[in-house]
Regions:
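Flavin (primarily FAD) binding-site architecture
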Residues: 1-5
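Short, ordered loop/turn segments at secondary-structure junctions
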Residues: 6-7, 31-34, 164
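Thiamine diphosphate
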Residues: 7-20, 26
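An anion/pyrophosphate-binding glycine-rich loop and adjacent beta-alpha core
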Residues: 18, 24-132, 193-199
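Short secondary-structure boundary/hinge segments and terminal tails
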Residues: 36-38, 137-138, 304
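Glycine- and aromatic-enriched mobile tails/lids
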Residues: 61, 66-70, 77, 140, ...
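FAD/FMN-dependent oxidoreductases across multiple families
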Residues: 114-159
Length: 336
């Protein structure tokens, strides 16, 4: 649901949307991890340049070949992902281009990083000679459907694992490769728990529901315009750095897209729903923590050591409350 993302097009929040509409509690929806080194080769999804390349001696530089991470963190280019992504974003906001400088990396680049080498070759770039253009990209959703450590959700009989689940194991930020815990470890736990349950007779799916779903997907070509508008707005307003104004703009954008695209696409409906939850979470967390950065609340606050649990049934009232508060604040500014 972000314009710049490593996620495949088949990953658009459907699992979270389905669980939410069934009544499941969602949590930590505001925490989206952005990977700093997506290869800016005009591809969708964006291919990644692994951190291992920086560990092997690659630098992050701007168009003046200045290493902008020097002095930011003791580990320089190997600082935590969120910090690197934020500083890449800052460079871009200042009008700079950002690059991965691999010219001092091992001569065995093609052997050690064949996938990255392949993308470079297709783009007409040689990592031994050329700077590789990069940009930060949406990579991993830490929030999702709230589960316990057995994979149980708030709904009896509904289990979740993988990126759709919010188990709490990542806190407010994710360490590289810890997604394996959510996919492989919790996948196994959930499967074992489900298999241990007595077999129940399942009711047949209502054919009217199937027809309704097909009806919602018949205008896919028209929906593409709105899907891109949504992704662009989410990246621009709810991306790496957020603030009150951008969050409200993002919410207005999503509501406008929802009004104009009614009935066009089930996929778009799911994207709109998940975007709303992310926006509400970002609005409520008036601090910066982990991969959630607000430029208007830069500090981490003790009174926000908590989770924001959200439900589909509360969505409209939450949105109305946020918009009313924003309107009142704007009115006071005009009066003053």
């Amino acid at each position: 649901i972000f314009a710049n993302t490593t996620n495949p097009r088949s990953s658009y929040g459907e699992g979270i949307a389905l669980a939410a509409q069934a009544g499941a509690v969602l949590t930590d929806m505001e925490f989206i991890q952005f990977h700093p080194t997506g290869l800016d080769f005009g591809l969708d999804p964006t291919p990644l340049a692994t951190e291992a390349i920086r560990g092997d001696g690659a630098y992050l530089v701007n168009q003046n070949e200045e290493r902008f991470m020097l002095g930011i963190h003791p580990e320089n280019e190997l600082a935590p992902r969120d910090l690197v992504a934020q500083n890449l974003f800052k460079q871009i906001e200042q009008g700079n281009s950002v690059f991965l400088d691999c010219r001092k990396v091992s001569n065995e680049f093609e052997t050690k990083y064949p996938q990255v080498a392949s993308y470079c070759q297709a783009a007409g770039l040689n990592p031994k000679i050329d700077l590789l253009p990069i940009l930060p990209v949406a990579h991993y959703h830490i929030g999702g459907v709230k589960t316990d450590l057995e994979g149980k959700t708030s709904i009896e009989g509904l289990w979740c694992c993988g990126e759709v689940a919010a188990t709490g194991i990542h806190g407010a930020n994710r360490l590289a490769s810890n997604s394996l815990l959510e996919s492989m470890v919790f996948g196994r736990i959930v499967a074992k728990n489900i298999n241990s349950l007595p077999i129940k007779k399942v009711n047949k799916i209502n054919p009217d529901f199937i027809r309704m779903h097909k009806e919602k997907t018949k205008n896919r070509i028209r929906a593409k315009k709105y899907i891109w508008q949504l992704r662009s707005s989410m990246m621009r307003n709810i991306g790496i750095v957020r603030n009150h104004s951008s969050i409200i703009r993002g919410l207005h954008d999503i509501l406008k897209i929802e009004r104009e695209s009614k009935g066009l696409s089930a996929k778009l409906n799911d994207m709109i729903l998940v975007s709303k939850f992310i926006i509400i979470g970002a609005y409520l967390r008036k601090e910066s923590r982990g991969c959630h950065l607000r430029s208007d609340y830069k500090n981490t606050e003790d009174n926000f050591i908590l989770h924001f649990d959200l439900k589909f049934s509360d969505l409209d009232s939450k949105i109305t409350e946020i918009l009313n508060l924003a309107d009142n604040a704007n009115h006071k500014q005009v009066v003053n």
